[in-house]
From Swiss-Prot:
Residues annotated with Phosphoserine modification: 407, 412, 414
Record protein name field: Protein krasavietz
CDD domains linked: W2_eIF5C_like (cd11560)
Sorted UniProt keywords: Phosphoprotein
Top-rank taxon: Eukaryota
InterPro entries: ARM-type_fold, eIF5-mimic_regulator, W2_BZW1/2, W2_domain
Phenotype on disruption: Mutant flies show defective one-day memory but normal learning.
Domain W2: 244-415
Annotated GO MF terms: ribosomal small subunit binding; ribosome binding; translation initiation factor binding
GO biological process: axon midline choice point recognition; behavioral response to ethanol; follicle cell of egg chamber development; long-term memory; negative regulation of translation; oogenesis; positive regulation of filopodium assembly
Similarity-based family: Belongs to the BZW family.
GO cellular component: axon; axonal growth cone; cytoplasm; filopodium; neuronal cell body
Protein backbone atom coordinates (compact mmCIF):
# COMPACT_ATOMS: atom_id res chain seq x y z
CA UNK A 1 0.00 0.00 0.00
CA UNK A 2 1.59 3.27 -1.14
CA UNK A 3 1.93 6.15 1.31
CA UNK A 4 1.47 9.77 0.36
CA UNK A 5 4.85 11.52 0.39
CA UNK A 6 5.02 14.83 2.19
CA UNK A 7 6.05 17.83 0.15
CA UNK A 8 9.20 19.60 1.31
CA UNK A 9 8.70 22.91 3.11
CA UNK A 10 11.35 25.62 3.08
CA UNK A 11 12.21 26.66 6.62
CA UNK A 12 11.47 30.30 7.30
CA UNK A 13 9.10 30.45 4.31
CA UNK A 14 5.91 32.47 5.08
CA UNK A 15 2.79 31.05 3.48
CA UNK A 16 0.73 33.90 2.10
CA UNK A 17 -3.03 33.84 2.73
CA UNK A 18 -5.10 34.05 -0.42
CA UNK A 19 -7.26 37.14 -0.72
CA UNK A 20 -10.42 35.07 -0.94
CA UNK A 21 -9.59 33.49 2.43
CA UNK A 22 -9.12 36.83 4.11
CA UNK A 23 -12.14 38.08 6.00
CA UNK A 24 -12.96 41.71 6.46
CA UNK A 25 -13.63 42.98 9.93
CA UNK A 26 -17.35 42.91 10.84
CA UNK A 27 -18.45 46.53 10.68
CA UNK A 28 -22.25 46.94 11.00
CA UNK A 29 -21.86 50.65 11.83
CA UNK A 30 -19.94 51.28 8.62
CA UNK A 31 -22.60 49.41 6.63
CA UNK A 32 -25.34 51.39 8.37
CA UNK A 33 -23.62 54.70 7.57
CA UNK A 34 -23.36 53.75 3.88
CA UNK A 35 -27.03 52.73 3.64
CA UNK A 36 -28.29 55.81 5.50
CA UNK A 37 -26.20 58.07 3.23
CA UNK A 38 -27.81 56.43 0.20
CA UNK A 39 -31.33 56.69 1.63
CA UNK A 40 -30.87 60.38 2.46
CA UNK A 41 -30.18 61.12 -1.21
CA UNK A 42 -33.60 59.71 -2.18
CA UNK A 43 -35.38 62.30 0.01
CA UNK A 44 -37.91 59.64 1.02
CA UNK A 45 -39.17 58.86 -2.49
CA UNK A 46 -40.05 55.15 -2.17
CA UNK A 47 -39.49 54.48 -5.86
CA UNK A 48 -36.01 55.99 -5.58
CA UNK A 49 -35.38 54.01 -2.38
CA UNK A 50 -36.16 50.77 -4.24
CA UNK A 51 -33.81 51.74 -7.07
CA UNK A 52 -31.06 52.63 -4.61
CA UNK A 53 -31.43 49.33 -2.70
CA UNK A 54 -31.39 47.41 -5.97
CA UNK A 55 -28.10 48.93 -7.14
CA UNK A 56 -26.46 49.12 -3.68
CA UNK A 57 -26.60 45.34 -3.38
CA UNK A 58 -23.84 45.14 -5.98
CA UNK A 59 -21.50 47.22 -3.79
CA UNK A 60 -22.62 46.62 -0.21
CA UNK A 61 -22.48 43.19 1.45
CA UNK A 62 -26.17 42.36 1.91
CA UNK A 63 -25.31 38.72 2.62
CA UNK A 64 -23.31 39.70 5.67
CA UNK A 65 -25.34 42.67 6.85
CA UNK A 66 -28.88 41.70 5.87
CA UNK A 67 -30.10 41.99 9.46
CA UNK A 68 -28.67 45.52 9.72
CA UNK A 69 -30.31 46.47 6.42
CA UNK A 70 -33.75 45.40 7.69
CA UNK A 71 -33.16 47.20 11.01
CA UNK A 72 -32.65 50.41 9.05
CA UNK A 73 -35.64 49.95 6.75
CA UNK A 74 -37.95 49.17 9.69
CA UNK A 75 -36.64 51.32 12.56
CA UNK A 76 -34.27 53.75 10.83
CA UNK A 77 -31.07 52.54 12.48
CA UNK A 78 -29.26 49.72 14.28
CA UNK A 79 -31.57 48.05 16.81
CA UNK A 80 -29.98 47.02 20.09
CA UNK A 81 -31.52 44.68 22.72
CA UNK A 82 -34.62 46.29 24.20
CA UNK A 83 -35.66 47.95 20.94
CA UNK A 84 -33.70 51.22 21.09
CA UNK A 85 -31.49 52.60 18.30
CA UNK A 86 -27.70 52.52 18.61
CA UNK A 87 -26.42 56.10 18.86
CA UNK A 88 -22.86 55.38 17.68
CA UNK A 89 -21.60 57.61 14.85
CA UNK A 90 -22.50 61.04 13.48
CA UNK A 91 -25.84 60.08 11.89
CA UNK A 92 -27.15 56.97 13.65
CA UNK A 93 -30.68 57.16 12.25
CA UNK A 94 -32.67 58.01 9.13
CA UNK A 95 -36.29 59.13 9.06
CA UNK A 96 -36.87 57.23 5.82
CA UNK A 97 -38.18 54.07 7.47
CA UNK A 98 -41.44 52.38 8.46
CA UNK A 99 -41.45 53.79 11.99
CA UNK A 100 -41.43 57.38 10.67
CA UNK A 101 -44.02 56.75 7.94
CA UNK A 102 -47.72 57.69 8.29
CA UNK A 103 -49.91 54.97 9.91
CA UNK A 104 -52.35 54.84 6.97
CA UNK A 105 -52.73 51.55 5.11
CA UNK A 106 -51.88 53.30 1.84
CA UNK A 107 -48.52 54.29 3.32
CA UNK A 108 -47.97 50.78 4.71
CA UNK A 109 -48.73 49.13 1.36
CA UNK A 110 -46.27 51.45 -0.39
CA UNK A 111 -43.56 50.48 2.09
CA UNK A 112 -44.48 46.82 1.63
CA UNK A 113 -43.50 47.12 -2.03
CA UNK A 114 -40.00 48.29 -1.08
CA UNK A 115 -39.48 45.01 0.80
CA UNK A 116 -41.13 42.89 -1.91
CA UNK A 117 -38.87 44.33 -4.63
CA UNK A 118 -35.74 44.03 -2.49
CA UNK A 119 -36.31 40.39 -1.50
CA UNK A 120 -37.37 39.47 -5.03
CA UNK A 121 -34.08 40.96 -6.33
CA UNK A 122 -31.90 39.33 -3.64
CA UNK A 123 -33.53 35.97 -2.86
CA UNK A 124 -31.00 35.10 -0.16
CA UNK A 125 -32.55 37.84 1.99
CA UNK A 126 -35.75 35.78 2.46
CA UNK A 127 -34.40 33.65 5.31
CA UNK A 128 -32.60 36.64 6.86
CA UNK A 129 -35.84 38.63 6.88
CA UNK A 130 -37.69 35.81 8.64
CA UNK A 131 -34.98 35.70 11.33
CA UNK A 132 -35.00 39.51 11.56
CA UNK A 133 -38.74 39.53 12.27
CA UNK A 134 -38.28 37.02 15.08
CA UNK A 135 -35.88 39.48 16.68
CA UNK A 136 -37.85 42.68 15.97
CA UNK A 137 -41.08 41.27 17.42
CA UNK A 138 -39.28 40.52 20.67
CA UNK A 139 -38.41 44.22 20.89
CA UNK A 140 -41.98 45.57 20.57
CA UNK A 141 -42.10 46.65 24.20
CA UNK A 142 -39.31 49.14 23.46
CA UNK A 143 -41.23 50.76 20.59
CA UNK A 144 -43.75 53.60 20.88
CA UNK A 145 -47.50 52.82 20.56
CA UNK A 146 -47.49 54.35 17.06
CA UNK A 147 -44.47 52.26 16.02
CA UNK A 148 -46.20 49.12 17.28
CA UNK A 149 -49.29 49.88 15.20
CA UNK A 150 -47.17 50.36 12.07
CA UNK A 151 -45.18 47.19 12.74
CA UNK A 152 -48.39 45.19 13.36
CA UNK A 153 -49.89 46.42 10.09
CA UNK A 154 -46.71 45.73 8.15
CA UNK A 155 -46.40 42.28 9.71
CA UNK A 156 -49.96 41.52 8.58
CA UNK A 157 -49.03 42.56 5.03
CA UNK A 158 -45.88 40.42 5.13
CA UNK A 159 -47.90 37.45 6.36
CA UNK A 160 -50.43 37.94 3.57
CA UNK A 161 -47.77 38.11 0.84
CA UNK A 162 -45.78 35.22 2.30
CA UNK A 163 -42.64 37.18 3.20
CA UNK A 164 -42.78 35.72 6.72
CA UNK A 165 -44.50 32.53 8.00
CA UNK A 166 -47.32 32.74 10.58
CA UNK A 167 -45.31 30.85 13.21
CA UNK A 168 -43.06 33.92 13.59
CA UNK A 169 -45.84 35.32 15.81
CA UNK A 170 -45.10 32.66 18.43
CA UNK A 171 -42.17 34.79 19.67
CA UNK A 172 -44.80 37.15 21.13
CA UNK A 173 -45.65 34.40 23.62
CA UNK A 174 -43.14 35.94 25.97
CA UNK A 175 -43.82 36.77 29.61
CA UNK A 176 -42.60 40.39 29.50
CA UNK A 177 -44.75 41.09 26.41
CA UNK A 178 -47.82 39.31 27.77
CA UNK A 179 -48.13 40.67 31.30
CA UNK A 180 -48.64 44.30 30.19
CA UNK A 181 -51.01 43.34 27.36
CA UNK A 182 -48.53 44.41 24.64
CA UNK A 183 -48.55 41.04 22.84
CA UNK A 184 -52.38 40.94 22.78
CA UNK A 185 -52.67 44.55 21.62
CA UNK A 186 -50.18 43.88 18.80
CA UNK A 187 -51.99 40.72 17.66
CA UNK A 188 -55.39 42.42 17.64
CA UNK A 189 -54.09 45.17 15.35
CA UNK A 190 -52.43 42.56 13.15
CA UNK A 191 -55.55 40.36 12.96
CA UNK A 192 -57.77 43.30 12.03
CA UNK A 193 -55.38 44.37 9.28
CA UNK A 194 -55.05 40.81 7.98
CA UNK A 195 -58.84 40.40 7.87
CA UNK A 196 -59.21 43.71 6.04
CA UNK A 197 -56.58 42.76 3.45
CA UNK A 198 -57.33 39.10 2.81
CA UNK A 199 -60.51 38.07 4.63
CA UNK A 200 -61.23 36.15 7.81
CA UNK A 201 -61.07 32.67 6.22
CA UNK A 202 -57.49 33.26 5.14
CA UNK A 203 -56.63 34.58 8.61
CA UNK A 204 -58.02 31.44 10.27
CA UNK A 205 -56.02 29.35 7.81
CA UNK A 206 -52.84 31.28 8.67
CA UNK A 207 -53.42 30.81 12.42
CA UNK A 208 -53.78 27.06 11.93
CA UNK A 209 -50.72 26.91 9.70
CA UNK A 210 -48.67 28.77 12.31
CA UNK A 211 -49.88 26.59 15.18
CA UNK A 212 -51.52 29.54 16.93
CA UNK A 213 -55.14 28.40 16.91
CA UNK A 214 -54.81 26.49 20.19
CA UNK A 215 -52.55 29.08 21.86
CA UNK A 216 -54.59 32.30 21.55
CA UNK A 217 -55.49 32.41 25.25
CA UNK A 218 -51.76 32.25 26.10
CA UNK A 219 -51.29 35.80 24.74
CA UNK A 220 -53.70 37.23 27.33
CA UNK A 221 -52.30 38.59 30.62
CA UNK A 222 -52.59 35.82 33.28
CA UNK A 223 -55.16 37.77 35.31
CA UNK A 224 -57.45 38.14 32.27
CA UNK A 225 -57.48 34.58 30.97
CA UNK A 226 -61.21 33.94 31.15
CA UNK A 227 -63.55 32.73 28.41
CA UNK A 228 -65.79 35.75 28.92
CA UNK A 229 -62.96 38.28 28.53
CA UNK A 230 -61.58 36.40 25.51
CA UNK A 231 -64.98 36.57 23.84
CA UNK A 232 -65.47 40.24 24.69
CA UNK A 233 -62.05 41.30 23.32
CA UNK A 234 -62.44 39.61 19.94
CA UNK A 235 -66.10 40.54 19.50
CA UNK A 236 -65.22 44.20 20.18
CA UNK A 237 -62.74 44.00 17.29
CA UNK A 238 -65.34 42.28 15.04
CA UNK A 239 -63.29 39.08 15.01
CA UNK A 240 -66.23 36.78 15.78
CA UNK A 241 -64.75 33.90 13.80
CA UNK A 242 -61.73 33.75 16.10
CA UNK A 243 -64.10 33.25 19.04
CA UNK A 244 -65.65 30.32 17.14
CA UNK A 245 -62.20 28.93 16.35
CA UNK A 246 -61.21 29.15 20.01
CA UNK A 247 -64.40 27.38 21.11
CA UNK A 248 -63.79 24.60 18.59
CA UNK A 249 -60.20 24.20 19.79
CA UNK A 250 -61.27 24.17 23.43
CA UNK A 251 -63.89 21.54 22.59
CA UNK A 252 -61.33 19.34 20.81
CA UNK A 253 -58.96 19.62 23.76
CA UNK A 254 -61.78 18.70 26.16
CA UNK A 255 -62.68 15.68 24.02
CA UNK A 256 -59.08 14.45 24.08
CA UNK A 257 -59.02 14.93 27.84
CA UNK A 258 -62.28 12.99 28.21
CA UNK A 259 -61.00 10.14 26.05
CA UNK A 260 -57.84 9.79 28.14
CA UNK A 261 -59.82 9.92 31.39
CA UNK A 262 -62.13 7.19 30.07
CA UNK A 263 -59.18 4.99 29.10
CA UNK A 264 -57.67 5.45 32.57
CA UNK A 265 -60.98 4.60 34.29
CA UNK A 266 -61.46 1.45 32.19
CA UNK A 267 -57.88 0.31 32.78
CA UNK A 268 -58.40 0.89 36.51
CA UNK A 269 -61.55 -1.29 36.29
CA UNK A 270 -63.69 1.45 37.77
CA UNK A 271 -67.42 0.52 38.10
CA UNK A 272 -69.55 1.71 35.15
CA UNK A 273 -71.88 3.73 37.33
CA UNK A 274 -68.89 5.74 38.60
CA UNK A 275 -67.51 6.16 35.07
CA UNK A 276 -70.94 7.34 33.91
CA UNK A 277 -71.13 9.84 36.75
CA UNK A 278 -67.61 11.14 35.99
CA UNK A 279 -68.43 11.59 32.29
CA UNK A 280 -71.66 13.44 33.04
CA UNK A 281 -69.86 15.80 35.41
CA UNK A 282 -67.18 16.41 32.78
CA UNK A 283 -69.72 17.02 30.00
CA UNK A 284 -71.56 19.59 32.13
CA UNK A 285 -68.32 21.48 32.82
CA UNK A 286 -67.23 21.47 29.17
CA UNK A 287 -70.67 21.66 27.49
CA UNK A 288 -70.08 18.55 25.38
CA UNK A 289 -73.53 17.19 24.38
CA UNK A 290 -74.53 13.53 24.67
CA UNK A 291 -74.48 12.96 20.89
CA UNK A 292 -70.77 13.83 20.90
CA UNK A 293 -70.06 12.00 24.18
CA UNK A 294 -71.45 8.72 22.83
CA UNK A 295 -69.20 8.93 19.76
CA UNK A 296 -66.16 9.48 22.02
CA UNK A 297 -67.15 6.46 24.13
CA UNK A 298 -67.47 4.29 21.00
CA UNK A 299 -64.09 5.42 19.62
CA UNK A 300 -62.42 4.86 22.98
CA UNK A 301 -63.73 1.37 23.65
CA UNK A 302 -62.94 0.27 20.08
CA UNK A 303 -59.39 1.59 20.45
CA UNK A 304 -58.93 -0.71 23.46
CA UNK A 305 -59.67 -3.88 21.48
CA UNK A 306 -56.92 -6.10 20.05
CA UNK A 307 -58.65 -7.29 16.92
CA UNK A 308 -58.14 -10.54 15.08
CA UNK A 309 -56.91 -10.03 11.53
CA UNK A 310 -59.24 -12.76 10.23
CA UNK A 311 -62.53 -11.27 9.07
CA UNK A 312 -64.53 -14.39 9.96
CA UNK A 313 -63.43 -14.17 13.61
CA UNK A 314 -63.57 -10.44 14.22
CA UNK A 315 -67.40 -10.17 14.27
CA UNK A 316 -67.87 -12.46 17.27
CA UNK A 317 -64.87 -10.87 18.95
CA UNK A 318 -66.36 -7.37 18.48
CA UNK A 319 -69.76 -8.42 19.85
CA UNK A 320 -68.16 -9.99 22.95
CA UNK A 321 -66.02 -6.88 23.49
CA UNK A 322 -68.91 -4.40 23.06
CA UNK A 323 -71.30 -6.38 25.26
CA UNK A 324 -69.25 -5.32 28.28
CA UNK A 325 -69.76 -1.63 27.50
CA UNK A 326 -73.46 -1.57 26.60
CA UNK A 327 -74.51 -0.14 30.02
CA UNK A 328 -72.08 2.75 29.49
CA UNK A 329 -73.34 3.44 25.96
CA UNK A 330 -76.96 3.15 27.08
CA UNK A 331 -76.45 5.91 29.67
CA UNK A 332 -75.64 8.39 26.90
CA UNK A 333 -78.05 7.16 24.22
CA UNK A 334 -80.51 9.53 25.85
CA UNK A 335 -81.86 11.29 22.76
CA UNK A 336 -82.77 10.40 19.19
CA UNK A 337 -79.81 12.47 18.04
CA UNK A 338 -77.31 10.57 20.20
CA UNK A 339 -78.69 7.19 19.04
CA UNK A 340 -78.42 8.19 15.39
CA UNK A 341 -74.92 9.58 15.97
CA UNK A 342 -73.87 6.20 17.37
CA UNK A 343 -75.27 4.23 14.41
CA UNK A 344 -73.53 6.56 11.96
CA UNK A 345 -70.25 6.20 13.86
CA UNK A 346 -70.54 2.41 13.78
CA UNK A 347 -71.24 2.60 10.02
CA UNK A 348 -68.19 4.81 9.50
CA UNK A 349 -65.97 2.55 11.63
CA UNK A 350 -67.01 -0.62 9.81
CA UNK A 351 -66.53 1.07 6.44
CA UNK A 352 -63.04 2.36 7.29
CA UNK A 353 -61.93 -0.94 8.89
CA UNK A 354 -62.47 -3.56 6.21
CA UNK A 355 -62.39 -6.54 8.60
CA UNK A 356 -65.52 -5.15 10.28
CA UNK A 357 -67.60 -4.79 7.11
CA UNK A 358 -69.62 -7.92 7.95
CA UNK A 359 -69.89 -7.05 11.64
CA UNK A 360 -72.19 -4.04 11.26
CA UNK A 361 -75.53 -5.88 11.49
CA UNK A 362 -74.44 -7.96 14.50
CA UNK A 363 -73.29 -4.84 16.36
CA UNK A 364 -76.57 -3.00 15.70
CA UNK A 365 -78.53 -6.11 16.75
CA UNK A 366 -76.57 -6.24 20.02
CA UNK A 367 -77.32 -2.58 20.69
CA UNK A 368 -81.01 -3.18 19.96
CA UNK A 369 -81.21 -6.15 22.35
CA UNK A 370 -79.43 -4.23 25.12
CA UNK A 371 -81.66 -1.17 24.59
CA UNK A 372 -78.82 1.11 23.53
CA UNK A 373 -80.68 1.70 20.24
CA UNK A 374 -84.42 1.91 19.72
CA UNK A 375 -86.43 0.34 16.92
CA UNK A 376 -87.57 3.79 15.76
CA UNK A 377 -84.03 5.14 15.26
CA UNK A 378 -82.80 1.99 13.51
CA UNK A 379 -85.70 2.31 11.03
CA UNK A 380 -85.01 6.02 10.57
CA UNK A 381 -81.34 5.26 9.84
CA UNK A 382 -82.37 2.63 7.30
CA UNK A 383 -84.89 4.83 5.49
CA UNK A 384 -83.15 8.19 5.41
CA UNK A 385 -80.54 8.72 8.13
CA UNK A 386 -77.64 6.60 6.79
CA UNK A 387 -74.47 8.05 5.30
CA UNK A 388 -73.07 7.17 1.87
CA UNK A 389 -70.11 5.25 3.32
CA UNK A 390 -70.70 1.64 2.25
CA UNK A 391 -74.37 2.52 1.92
CA UNK A 392 -75.54 -0.37 -0.32
CA UNK A 393 -73.50 -2.98 1.56
CA UNK A 394 -74.83 -2.00 4.99
CA UNK A 395 -78.43 -1.49 3.87
CA UNK A 396 -78.44 -4.98 2.34
CA UNK A 397 -76.88 -6.38 5.51
CA UNK A 398 -79.66 -4.80 7.58
CA UNK A 399 -82.54 -5.62 5.22
CA UNK A 400 -83.85 -8.79 6.91
CA UNK A 401 -83.50 -7.31 10.39
CA UNK A 402 -85.37 -4.18 9.30
CA UNK A 403 -88.10 -6.28 7.66
CA UNK A 404 -88.47 -8.18 10.94
CA UNK A 405 -88.71 -4.88 12.86
CA UNK A 406 -91.34 -3.56 10.45
CA UNK A 407 -93.45 -6.74 10.62
CA UNK A 408 -93.22 -6.71 14.43
CA UNK A 409 -94.31 -3.08 14.38
CA UNK A 410 -97.28 -3.89 12.11
CA UNK A 411 -98.35 -6.79 14.35
CA UNK A 412 -98.19 -4.50 17.37
CA UNK A 413 -100.31 -1.89 15.60
CA UNK A 414 -102.82 -4.58 14.55
CA UNK A 415 -103.13 -5.85 18.13
CA UNK A 416 -103.67 -2.28 19.38
CA UNK A 417 -106.45 -1.76 16.83
CA UNK A 418 -108.16 -5.01 17.89
CA UNK A 419 -108.02 -3.99 21.55
CA UNK A 420 -109.44 -0.59 20.74
CA UNK A 421 -112.24 -2.21 18.74
CA UNK A 422 -113.36 -4.52 21.54
Amino acid sequence: MSQKTERPVLSGQRIKTRKRDEREKYDPTGFRDAVIAGLEKTEGDLEQISKYLDSAGNKLDYRRYGEVLFDILIAGGLLVPGGSISQDGEKPRTSYCIFDAPESMESMRNHEQVFVKLIRRYKYLEKMFEEEMGKVLLFVKGFTPSERIKLARMTALWLVNGSVPPNVLLVLNNEHLIKDGIALEFLLELFQTFKQEKGIAYLIQALKKGGLESKLMDFFPPNKRTEEYFKQVFLDKELNEIVKLHKAQASQEAKRELQQALIDDINDEKPYNEITSDIKDFSQRTNIPDHEIIVIIWSTIMSLGEWNKKEELVTDQAVRHLKNYCPLLQAFASTDRSELALILKVQEFCYENMNFMKAFQKIILLFYKTEVLSEEIILRWYKEGHSNKGKMHFLEQMRKFVEWLQSAEEESESEDEQKNGE
